[in-house]
Amino acid sequence: MEIKKYILKKFDYDVNVSNKKFYTPNETIKQKLGINVKFLEDRKNMNLTFKIDMLDNDNIDILKLKVEYILTLNNEALDISESFIKKILSKFYPIFSKLILNFYNSIGLNNVQLPEFWAKEKGIQKMDTFFTLLYYLFPYILS
């Protein structure tokens, strides 16, 4: 199953400007990634939502980010399973990652990298054609 096309539907973020703190290379930045996948009725199109919460050493919010896509597959998905979802995500994650890394660089978080989305899977919930994947990503040390 291949991704035929994708459209960026929404890019929303909130930066904690009240913090007024500059981050140094030896600080740990923690990221929490949530992924929501919902297949539409035709089972060929899907909504894909990524949510990232970024926290500093003191568990103070640095950034909240929500990115929504609509993906169109080349064929109708016949068997929507956890392994199928992970396969689609593994193909799409590099596209998402490139967008986010460019965004991070534009707001001054030049050395923060996104870990691979399967780093430490916390849980998967399935509701018919709707999956919610939560991942607690490894803390990333700025360097």
Give the positions of each predicted feature:
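N-terminal intrinsically disordered, cationic/polar leader segments
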Residues: 1-91, 98, 105-131
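Aromatic (phenylalanine/tyrosine) cluster motif
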Residues: 130-131, 135-140
